[in-house]
């Protein structure tokens, strides 16, 4: 019985033990080729629909022919950049860098915070800026797009854009709260920002980013616990506050001797 059990166990392991490295490499190479070709086609397809004047890509291909921060900039453009970094360095060095330069030139509306740029008029889509919308769009651009981009590329012009947006968002913190002035108190935006400021702290060592993250976390840990809120959504939007608080928790666990850490966050980290 023991011998039979050993034989069965050996037979289960044998494919892995005796796999041909050359076959594995060939299979992995084919999978990588398929993925890279798809990435290349994705970029080529979107660039065919870029605005011929500005070179920016639209929000979608059906009706929203404008560049915006929360969709075009956050969810599409950065992954075009990543795709071309792997598949086409000429496009990476050319159109991808050009889009970054152009979107800051034409879409920045309040300081470095971008607004929707309408292709038909080559101007802002609305007559006046809406600050909550600008902060939301910038936070999405940071968290959804620029963070993964920077974590692969390292220091680059996109790093400057990300840090500039994080600085600009805090410059427009106008919501008076129990922990001081905040740029937002929504679960989604605050969660985006806690993730952004936490990563920026690890990237740069700048304690201002850590302190911004702690201040946002204190609002929730000390006064407005998400688990006590009327609604805690764990979908693609509401879940951001959980991720953000988790990243601040980790910083607090590592830096528990720093006086800037909110007391409740420190207690939970212990």
Model feature map: region roles:
Residues 5-15:
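Bacterial N-terminal signal peptides
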């Amino acid at each position: 019985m023991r011998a039979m059990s050993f034989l069965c166990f050996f037979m289960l392991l044998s494919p892995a033990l005796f796999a041909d490295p050359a076959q594995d490499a060939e299979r992995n190479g084919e999978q990588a080729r398929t993925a890279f070709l798809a990435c290349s086609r994705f970029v080529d397809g979107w660039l065919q629909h870029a605005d011929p004047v500005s070179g920016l890509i639209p929000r979608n291909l059906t009706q929203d022919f404008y560049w915006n921060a929360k969709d075009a900039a956050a969810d599409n453009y950065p992954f075009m950049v990543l795709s071309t970094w792997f598949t086409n360095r000429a496009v990476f060095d050319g159109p991808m860098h050009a889009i970054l330069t152009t979107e800051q030139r034409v879409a920045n509306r309040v300081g470095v915070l971008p607004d929707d740029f309408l292709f038909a008029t080559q101007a802002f889509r609305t007559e006046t800026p809406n600050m909550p919308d600008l902060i939301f769009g910038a936070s999405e651009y940071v968290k959804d797009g620029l963070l993964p981009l920077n974590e692969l590329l390292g220091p680059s012009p996109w790093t400057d854009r990300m840090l500039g947006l994080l600085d600009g968002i805090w410059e427009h913190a106008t919501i008076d709260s129990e922990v001081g002035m905040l740029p937002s108190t929504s679960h989604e935006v605050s969660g985006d920002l806690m993730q952004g400021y936490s990563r920026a702290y690890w990237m740069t060592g700048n304690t201002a980013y850590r302190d911004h993250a702690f201040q946002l976390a204190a609002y929730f840990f000390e006064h407005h616990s998400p688990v006590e809120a009327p609604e805690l959504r764990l979908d693609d939007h509401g879940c951001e506050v959980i991720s953000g608080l988790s990243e601040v928790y980790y910083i607090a666990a590592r830096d528990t001797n720093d006086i800037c850490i909110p007391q409740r966050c420190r207690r939970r980290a212990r």
